Each structure stands twice: as C-alpha cells, then as structure tokens.
Amino acid sequence: MTTIAVVGATGQVGQVMRTLLEERNFPADTVRFFASPRSAGRKIEFRGTEIEVEDITQATEESLKDIDVALFSAGGTASKQYAPLFAAAGATVVDNSSAWRKDDEVPLIVSEVNPSDKDSLVKGIIANPNCTTMAAMPVLKPLHDAAGLVKLHVSSYQAVSGSGLAGVETLAKQVAAVGDHNVEFVHDGQAADAGDVGPYVSPIAYNVLPFAGNLVDDGTFETDEEQKLRNESRKILGLPDLKVSGTCVRVPVFTGHTLTIHAEFDKAITVEQAQEILGAASGVKLVDVPTPLAAAGIDESLVGRIRQDSTVDDNRGLVLVVSGDNLRKGAALNTIQIAELLVK
C-alpha cells in the first residue's frame, strides 16, 4: 500500500502534478492533498472521487506516518518548515523549491540524468532543479558523456509563469490595458500605459526584461536565476569546476522557457554526431526550430538549431537552442518521475 501526498496541491504547479498523477496512473493506493489554511477544506476531484485539502499548518508527525512519498511545491519557506516534518514521519520528500538544492546532503535529481542519486539520501529529502536548468540537463548530459563538457555560455528566455500566477496575471492585464494601442509602440515605447508592473522591474507586455529573478547581494551583479543555472548544472552533472556564465531574460510568453546554449567540450564533436546522440536521448526531442509554444504541454526538452561554434577551435564547440515547458517537465513532471523511481 503506497500513500502519496501533494503539498501545495492547489497552486499552479500543484495543479499540474495532480493532472500528471492521473495521466501516468501513478501507483498510489491513497493520495492526500495539503495546502495553506486559505485553501484547506476545499474538495478536489481526483480519480473519480473527491479529496478534501488538508491544512498543512495542522500537520503533525503522527498524522503523517502513513505517507510514503511527499511531493512539495509550496515555496521555499513552507518547504524549510514542513519538509523535515514529513521526512521525520517516514516519508521521502521530493521538493520543487530552491530551499534544499545547495544542501550537500540533499541530492538534486533530473530523472533522465542522475537517477541513482536517489540512493544517497541523508535527510530524506530530494531536490528538484530550477526549471531553466531542467530544460538543459537532458540535452547536455549525453553530449557531456560523449565529449566532456568544460564550459557553458547560456542565455535564457523565460516565460512569465516562472514567476507564478502573479506573472501570468500581470502579462494578461498589461496586454488588455494596452489594447489596440499596441502598434503605437512601433515609434514610442511610452505610447501606452501598461499599468502595474507586478513582480517585474518594468512592464513585461511587448517587452523583454534582461533581469529574471532577484539580484544577489554578493558583488557579482548576477540574479539568483543565473546563479541557480551555474550551481545546479555543476551538481547534477557532477562537474564541480564546470565554467558556466548565464544571462536570464524574462519574455512576454505565458509558458515555455527557451535557452540558447554555447557549449565547449574537451573533445571534438560535430553537428552530425550531436544530432545522432540527441535523437536517441531520453527526455529529448530533436526538432528544426524549438519554440516555447511548441514545448508547452509536452514532456520532452525540444532541441534544435544545432551548429558548430566557430569561436571554439578543433570542432570542440556547439551552439544549440532548447525549449521546455517550465511547469510540466520544468517542475511537476520531474518531481513525479523521481517519485516513480522511489516506488518501483
């Protein structure tokens, strides 16, 4: 008998988790949903029955003892507070926030890349990577295995759903506020008032913001999104000295993160070799032109526009474009795939 819990079940990613649990016929005999007091008591239909959402603030170690796996997508603060409680009760926690990713005693797993790290549990917690890192890893791991990755230069173009419901609502409201005046931006960027900037530094509608995430106060002038890309790539690939430079950009797209990747390798690797490798890679779909709209709603990372990097000698560099659904594989799906590894 397997019992699974979804913490943050009523949120944006939690909703996708619930859908995927049903779609994939996850082998759980009992499912429990948890959320904040605001959503507690709400009834959610799941597999033909209604399940009442439980108040996470009322959870005790005793009340959680039947749970085998707990899927967390309730934010870092809630994860720090409640994930250890679930683990102490005997559950293995798979956490979607950034709370545990840098902890040396918590494995950071992409199911297609480093699944065996699930056997290295110390705290009973497994971390899910950031959605931008997630899109890149299934693509980069097989290329690394073939040629030895040594350096990455990445620009990411991240959808507003990566900022949560606030990001989605802000873009929708700004587009509506500008209305038919949008073409006036051709000649004047101040021609129309988009209204409240929401979680962003400037209007996101009809704009591109080269500032995704929050500025890290460490003198690097990087955002936390850019540092996550570096730190998480190193940890997942087992390359602590990997050189990674990234610029994370927020774009007016609802779902789907896109990355342009300049990858340098220790050994030569041609475009044809890369295409053959990626065509056979798990969690990857080779396409001509990856786009966020094409990626939205599918499981795989789309990869295309593969070229030789002319700035790297001896055919040791590749340029490629990756698009991935930041809510699906970038958050919910990988969490569930890890849980599937745990209950096999």
From Swiss-Prot:
It comes from Corynebacterium melassecola. Keywords: Amino-acid biosynthesis, Diaminopimelate biosynthesis, Lysine biosynthesis, Methionine biosynthesis, NADP, Oxidoreductase, Threonine biosynthesis. The keyword NADP applies. It is an enzyme of class 1 (oxidoreductase). NADP(+) binds at residues 10-13, 38-39, 161-162, 326. Substrate binds at residues 158, 250. GO terms for molecular function: aspartate-semialdehyde dehydrogenase activity; NAD binding; NADP binding; protein dimerization activity. Phosphate binds at residues 101, 228. Signal peptide: none annotated. The active site is at 131 (acyl-thioester intermediate), 257 (proton acceptor). Pathway: Amino-acid biosynthesis; L-lysine biosynthesis via DAP pathway; (S)-tetrahydrodipicolinate from L-aspartate: step 2/4; Amino-acid biosynthesis; L-methionine biosynthesis via de novo pathway; L-homoserine from L-aspartate: step 2/3; Amino-acid biosynthesis; L-threonine biosynthesis; L-threonine from L-aspartate: step 2/5. InterPro entries: Asp-semialdehyde_DH_CS (IPR000319), Asp_semialdehyde_DH (IPR012080), Asp_semialdehyde_DH_beta (IPR005986), NAD(P)-bd_dom_sf (IPR036291), Semialdehyde_DH_NAD-bd (IPR000534), Semialdhyde_DH_dimer_dom (IPR012280). It catalyses: L-aspartate 4-semialdehyde + phosphate + NADP(+) = 4-phospho-L-aspartate + NADPH + H(+). Catalyzes the NADPH-dependent formation of L-aspartate-semialdehyde (L-ASA) by the reductive dephosphorylation of L-aspartyl-4-phosphate. The lineage of its organism: Bacteria, Bacillati, Actinomycetota, Actinomycetes, Mycobacteriales. One of its GO terms (biological process) is diaminopimelate biosynthetic process. Transmembrane segments: none annotated. Belongs to the aspartate-semialdehyde dehydrogenase family. This is Aspartate-semialdehyde dehydrogenase. It holds the Pfam family Semialdhyde_dhC. Homodimer. It comes from the Bacteria. Its EC number is 1.2.1.11. PANTHER family: ASPARTATE-SEMIALDEHYDE DEHYDROGENASE (PTHR46278:SF2), DEHYDROGENASE, PUTATIVE-RELATED (PTHR46278).
